[in-house]
Amino acid sequence: FYRIVPPVVLMVLVTMPFTLLVRQDYVAGIGGQIAGVFGFMTNFYEMLTGGSYESQFIPHLFVHNWSLAVEVHYYILWGLVVWFLSKRSKSSSQLRGMVFLLSTGAFIISFFSMFIGSLMVSSHSSVYFSSLTHVYPFFLGSILATVVGVRQTSDLVKQFDRTWDLRQNLLVFAAGLLVLVLLTFFVKFTYLFAYLFGFLLASLAAVTMILAARVLHEKT
């Protein structure tokens, strides 16, 4: 709550005075935009109004909050699921296993929803903004957490710590960063490739960097 809500309120308070200096089409439906921000429903607001992340025809001041909306949906719903599993599991290892399996299943469903959906629609805005189709990177993070550990370091991280020297560790991190840079410059939101493989590659690159950073933390 304290990490998300106060910055969102501050963002709206700081942004609104500047609306006096921009074109009126930016503030059209501003009430709905603000409601979407505070309700963490900006992604659905953009879908209902026909918005596009790169659109110059329907500019919205808070369009970037679509990703925060997806994040909050994940935190609330997945948090409840993990809480329920924690009450049913008999050990931490059993809980980790159940979280891993459910995260994998949710990742597969979400990814293929975007993959198949992007082949069936004329405008990709719906699959781009939808929580169902764009939540799979968070489940990759859940999978990674069960593999590398959160409070306690897993055996996998310890193994990488033993087998990787500092140079190899940094190279793995740099490889993930390079993939993200290449995707940034060469893949646009209008490309079908972005929805079929681009976002997946970006997510895998980010996971690789997180893993490398975790191993590097153990080394230092």
Outline where the language-model segments fall.
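Hydrophobic membrane-embedded alpha-helices
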Residues: 2-220
